[in-house]
């Protein structure tokens, strides 16, 4: 990922998910997120409900909601993540499932 903005009020990242890749199924105690797809098609799981989002579509992820994004397509998926809350630290991640065995 690439950090575009890192302030006291929000953090903005550009995240690329390679074909066949996915992020952890996770949630956060101290922040909410908004994801906006800018390239590709995202398969997004929110509390066990799966939906597909393409270019320009956004999804709001409230604090505490379990979430994951997957790229089931043949082209890279790129989305913008805007974080709001009291902490944007990478330690505020509770991973339920992770392909890389991170805690």
Listing of model-derived features with the role each one plays in the protein:
Residues 68-103:
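Double-stranded beta-helix
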Residues 29-48:
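Glycine- and acidic-residue-biased ligand/ion/polar-headgroup-sensing regions
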Residues 4-5, 18, 38-41, 68-70:
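A structural signal for the main folded, soluble domain(s) of proteins
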Residues 21, 30-31, 49, 65-66, ...:
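A generic "binding-loop/recognition-motif" signal
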Residues 23, 49-51, 92:
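Short beta-strand segments
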Residues 46-67:
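Short acidic-glycine-tyrosine-enriched beta hairpin
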């Amino acid at each position: 990922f690439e950090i575009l903005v890192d302030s006291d009020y929000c953090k903005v990242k550009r995240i690329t998910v390679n074909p066949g890749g996915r992020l952890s199924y996770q949630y956060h105690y101290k922040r909410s997120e908004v994801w906006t797809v800018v390239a590709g098609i995202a398969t997004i799981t929110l509390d066990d409900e799966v939906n597909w989002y393409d270019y320009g579509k956004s999804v709001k992820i409230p604090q505490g909601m379990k979430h994951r994004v997957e790229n089931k397509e043949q082209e890279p998926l790129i989305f913008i993540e805007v974080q709001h809350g009291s902490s944007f630290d990478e330690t505020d991640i509770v991973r339920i499932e992770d392909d890389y065995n991170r805690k």
